[in-house]
Design a protein with these regions (language model features):
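NAD(P)H-binding glycine-rich loop region in Rossmannoid oxidoreductase-like domains
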Residues: 41-102
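Mid/C-terminal beta-alpha module of Rossmann-like enzyme folds, strongest
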Residues: 2-10, 17, 211-272, 287, ...
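Conserved Rossmann-fold NAD(P)-dependent oxidoreductase catalytic core, especially the SDR/UDP-sugar
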Residues: 93-141, 157
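Substrate-positioning beta->alpha
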Residues: 170-176, 191-213, 222-223
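NAD(P)-dependent short-chain dehydrogenase/reductase
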Residues: 152, 162-196, 241
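Short-chain dehydrogenase/reductase
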Residues: 85-89, 128, 132-144, 172-176, ...
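Conserved beta-loop-beta element that borders a ligand/cofactor-binding pocket
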Residues: 111, 144-168
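N-terminal Rossmann NAD(P)H-binding glycine-rich loop of SDR-like oxidoreductase domains
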Residues: 8-30
Length: 319
């Protein structure tokens, strides 16, 4: 296990988003100088105590100017589903250009879309990528751009994790789907309850990013690390929710066939069904390589992470 390295200044692109805010808070707590780049209308959602830079991320030159002097740039920009094909690659190019101009290390949050419907049960840094969805293909294209930039001297760290939950704000499978009907005593799970699914508690991912950033000089120019979070069955996940709320729930399931039919006219449903295999295909991330670099991977116990996540959503436990 390597010891801590240099700190410095980090600019978080998308600092008002769920990952951006969690990462900004983690870096600030670790003693970094943190700037949160946000749209003006979302400045109030950025991490308190960080420098707020109001910039439209679609303005590449403004982003490059805002990141001047950064040691690390985190691309935490959250592209809405409907705008993914139009904006994801240009925004990634902007982040690459900004980091290159500042000679900063670029950190990018990878996910599991890259591996497609034939993904294996165990995923590590050597697993071949065969995307079967539009989003997966775009993710591979983005990572290819970053790898090419690394060949030209840009240091890049991809932290690959499962589905995020926790943190401030909304936008995860947990709040949008699973606990949407919790007040009525119902949970909706997206897949078979006995299938293992990889989850990542946002605070833990943010802590891992800090530790990698502090060891950045010791990594390869293009480093991809798998973050092993909570690989649990749906049954284990909903049981943790029940324990947190001290009650049982009726379990419903996402009607994927209906959503697929509706996807013909509702683009967001089409995008969701494209990655529905993530809920029916058992999978887990192998975190051995990340452990070699930072030691024990940050992993808040599932019950505690679920309880904190529900509290952040304003959902109180009984008693």
């Amino acid at each position: 296990m390597a010891g801590p390295g240099m700190r410095g200044r980090i600019v978080v692109l998308g600092g008002a988003g769920r990952l951006g805010r969690a990462a900004a808070e983690a870096f600030k707590s670790a003693g970094w100088q943190v700037a949160s780049l946000v749209r003006g209308s979302s400045a109030g959602s950025a991490a308190p105590g960080t420098e707020i830079i109001e910039v439209d991320a679609r303005d590449a030159q403004a982003v490059i100017a805002a990141t001047s002097g950064a040691d690390v740039v985190l691309n935490a920009l959250n592209v809405p589903y409907a705008d993914w094909e139009r904006l994801a690659l240009p925004l990634a190019d902007t982040a690459i250009a900004a980091a290159r101009e500042s000679r900063a290390t670029l950190i990018f949050p990878g996910n599991l879309y890259n591996y497609g419907a034939g993904m294996p049960a165990r995923i590590d840094e050597t697993t071949a990528m065969h995307p079967t969805s539009r989003k997966g293909a775009m993710r591979v294209a983005i990572e290819t751009r970053m790898r090419e930039a690394a060949d030209g001297g840009l240091r890049t760290i991809v932290v690959r994790a499962g589905d995020y939950f926790g943190g401030e704000g909304r936008g995860s499978w947990l709040d949008r789907i699973i606990v949407k009907g919790i007040a009525a005593g119902r949970l909706t799970y997206p897949g078979p309850l006995d299938t293992i699914h990889e989850w990542a508690y946002l605070s833990d991912v943010a802590q891992a990013m800090v530790q990698l950033a502090e060891r950045r000089e010791r990594l390869a120019p293009f480093a991809t690390l798998g973050f092993a979070g909570h690989a649990v069955t749906g049954r284990e996940f909903v049981a943790a929710i029940s324990r947190a709320c001290r009650r049982d729930f009726k379990i419903d399931f996402v009607p994927w066939r209906l959503l697929k039919m509706m996807g013909v006219v509702v683009p967001v449903f089409r995008e969701l069904t494209d990655i529905s295999y993530l809920w029916s295909t058992p999978h887990a991330i192998d975190g051995a390589r990340l452990t070699e670099i930072i030691g024990e991977i940050p992993r808040t116990p599932l019950d505690r992470a679920i309880t904190a996540s529900l509290a952040a959503l304003g959902l109180k436990r009984r008693g």
